[in-house]
Amino acid sequence: MASCFMPAEFAEIMEPLLPPDLPVGPRGGRPRTPNLVALQVIWYVLTTGIRWQDVLPSMGCSGRTAHRRLRKWQEAGLWGMLHLTLLDLLHRDGKLDLNIAVVDSTLVPAPGGGDNTGPNPTDRGKTGTKHTLLVDGNGVPLAIRTTGANASDQKQLESIMQEFPRVKGKPGRPKEHPDAAFADRGYDSESNRLFLRWLGIEPFIAKRGTEHDSGLGCIRWVVERTNAWLKGLRRMRVRWDRLEVIQDAWNKLAMSVICFRLWCECPV
């Protein structure tokens, strides 16, 4: 597993997006925990998967405080801005292939239930969540959607493709859609193909009832690798947070961590 401690380079990218640390008021009182210290704890929880209440006092920030910052920054759109910033850096350095998009999903247990959960048909109906992931041709994560584990893959394709980000980093107008989209048999439907063609995207979706030798797996494998990278962030293996806003924050931060490691060529 890669380091559970936040690199200084990540803090440098994140710091301009953070709100300024508030000074102690005129009446005194306890100093507010610095944002970068809270960010270090959030990174640690994401990578190790520990519970908020198990955060050590020696880290300089309680788990409760870090949880509040995680939610507050998600509501302010900060995690989304971080993800876009890292995508821009990858695009600037020629590490994105936005001509191709690949879609796949993975199921995550959610023992405590919560928003966007449902019975997992592959796990005896236990409560779970489905993460639908969109990546570029190199496997860089572009978007994640969270639904109940029993949600149909067919119905997720339109929504996830509409979340294709407008990445800057190079001269010219940002690309609005990829040229081609790849998906497995779970997304096979004529309506999905018509929708993609309407957007100007060439669909490459494996058809149900056909042999597994279409050759599409030579391209689709990148999304399966990215799903494995996300599961390497232990907080993403099991969903413990019931609120949608917290899960969305984890999704965007996890994508940002993967993007950062690809950009700086760190172990993923």
What are these regions, as identified by a protein language model?
Residues 1-268:
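Short alpha-helical elements
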